[in-house]
From Swiss-Prot:
Protein name: Translation initiation factor IF-3
GO biological process: one example: ribosome disassembly
Main location: cytoplasm
UniProt keyword annotations, A-Z: Cytoplasm, Initiation factor, Protein biosynthesis
GO cellular component, one term: cytosol
Record region (Disordered): 170-217
Keyword Cytoplasm: yes
Length: 217
């Protein structure tokens, strides 16, 4: 409901189709009867479908409903604001060492709760071998399957082939786990100062370091 619905005495119709507190259908009743039931249940009569004939009204705690709706909307905006799409570029004939390096970056991004756009760049005669890019994307998706899933299947995009991986964990969960791990390392460093004097400072530097720009293989 985008606009404020009419509630209780603001409802001005002779009869309504009433829905009970648990979602049960009460049926069409006079408005006076619906208001009487609302008082008996110590709830509000809320018009949830004004354009229906007769209008549909439900018995509910409107204050609680508004609060829960606001919290859900706030959480949705929070998760949306944290959504980041990283990008990793690979060549179809990438060597094993470079592949492992790029895969490591993808793993890190997924652990952080970020989506990753994988771009396979074809050059020259490589463009006649799209299956090379497809197999490479399949291999990468399988290698990181425990951390992410294929959100957008491999597809051609001009001379490139792209695929999007999504994280299994929400961004907020990943950030919370990262903070907990960092605090645990700091506590360990304090308990064992001889082990690593600068452990806590190193963690802070790593946490604040910006993600590196995507590099070509």
């Amino acid at each position: 409901m985008s606009a404020e619905p009419r509630i209780n005495d603001r409802i001005r119709v002779p009869e309504v189709r009433l829905v009970g507190p648990s979602g049960e259908q009460v049926g069409i009743v006079p408005l006076a009867k619906a208001l009487e039931l609302a008082q008996e249940y110590d709830l509000d009569l809320v018009e949830v479908a004004a354009n229906a004939r007769p209008p549909v009204c439900k018995l509910m705690d409107y204050g609680k409903f508004k609060y829960e709706s606001a919290m859900k909307a706030r959480e949705a905006r929070k998760n949306q604001a944290h959504t980041v799409i990283k990008e990793m570029k690979l060549r179809p004939k990438i060597d094993p060492h470079d592949y492992d390096t790029k895969k490591g970056h993808v793993v890190r991004f997924l652990k952080q709760g970020d989506k990753v756009k994988i771009t396979i760049m074809f050059r020259g005669r490589e463009q006649s071998r799209p299956e090379l890019g497809y197999r490479l994307l399949q291999r990468l998706a399988e290698d990181v399957a425990d951390l992410g899933f294929v959100e957008s299947n491999p597809k051609q995009d001009g001379r490139n082939m792209i695929m999007v991986l999504g994280p299994h964990k929400k961004k907020t969960e990943a950030m919370a786990e990262a903070r907990q791990a960092q605090e645990a390392r700091k506590a360990d460093a304090k308990a064992n100062p001889g082990k690593s004097q600068n452990a806590a400072e190193t963690d802070d530097a790593e946490a604040e370091a910006p993600a590196e720009a995507p590099a070509e293989a």
